[in-house]
Amino acid sequence: MSNITDPQMWDYDGDPNFTGMPPIDEDYRPCRLETETLNKYVVIVTYALVFLLSLLGNSLVMLVILYSRVGRSVTDVYLLNLALADLLFALTLPIWAVSKVNGWIFGTLLCKVVSLLKEVNFYSGILLLACISVDRYLAIVHATRTLTQKRHLVKFVCLSCWGLSMILSLPFFLFRQAYHPKNSSPVCYEVLGNDTAKWRMVLRILPHTFGFIVPLFVMLFCYGFALCTLFKAHMGQKHRAMRVIFAVVLIFLLCWLPYNLVLLADTLMRTQLIKESCERRNDIGWALDATEILGFLHSCLNPIIYAFIGQNFRHGFLKILAMHGLVSKEFLARHHVTSYTSSSVNVSSNL
């Protein structure tokens, strides 16, 4: 998942064609973008698709993992929390979609709550991805199961991820409010008095650092050493794990690297390290909208990366269907699925 900022941060709707961060000065005149309305509705459709796909995919992941109480692995616990984070994030998308059209019409309380929920689940998702990479590193490079299989330790790590996510998200809860500038649509964003612009840069750099750069280096380090170990092993089953690891890193980079590069350029422009112009502002605004879509898409792809790509997940899902009489034992036999009463589901064995 990246940093994911609320849609109103990038598109200021005093007029449907105005773009830019919501100004503190009510006499501010932002740049115009003639095709902003079209872009707005493209984003709305994307929010809807991501919401539906994430709701379905992550719900299925949680269902399969929760059914595997006996054989649940450490990675399964991480995946369960990751699916929950993605699911909770997806639940906020309809509200942001409505705000794209009508501005923020939900008041300050919901502005704070929804912003907190979105940021918490963004941070927790990224931190859990990093934890999964550390777990794979220990299991593959050091063949360490004593540490990673301690359930109470894993639960503590997951709780720590949620707790740290809450701490990192507190500024959004404390300072965000519904704000209605003169002659403009209402917005949900941070209001910090005369220092709002400066603190908004801090709140942008914070998630850029903790939400992408740090987890990325952790993942690259852990998966890099894991891949080296697997290449030396020359084992067929481990080559399958290599493909999954490649998919994890590749999809993460494809989803979040473009957005964070554009976000970095936008931050440099707004801190006057690179020259700001209406043309550049509009280009960056378009790029942020486009690359943000990739970031949102990551919450839909997580079930594919960590679950659907694994044969055991498909078998586990079929076992659940068989337990409820939706498929026959003959169907399971044709698909080489062991009896659903003889073994439990393990989602992550192919990771």
Swiss-Prot record:
Residues 1-46, 98-112, 176-209, 265-289 are extracellular. The chain crosses the membrane at residues 47-67, 77-97, 113-133, 155-175, 210-230, 244-264, 290-310. The keyword rRNA processing does not apply. It is found in: Cell membrane. Pfam families: 7tm_1. One of its GO terms (cellular component) is external side of plasma membrane. Glycans are attached at N3, N194. SUPFAM superfamilies: Family A G protein-coupled receptor-like. One of its GO terms (biological process) is positive regulation of cytosolic calcium ion concentration. Disulfide bonds join C111-C188. PROSITE patterns: G_PROTEIN_RECEP_F1_1, G_PROTEIN_RECEP_F1_2. GO terms for molecular function: C-C chemokine binding; C-C chemokine receptor activity; C-X-C chemokine receptor activity; interleukin-8 binding. Belongs to the G-protein coupled receptor 1 family. Interacts with IL8. Interacts with GNAI2. This is C-X-C chemokine receptor type 1. It comes from Pongo pygmaeus (Bornean orangutan).
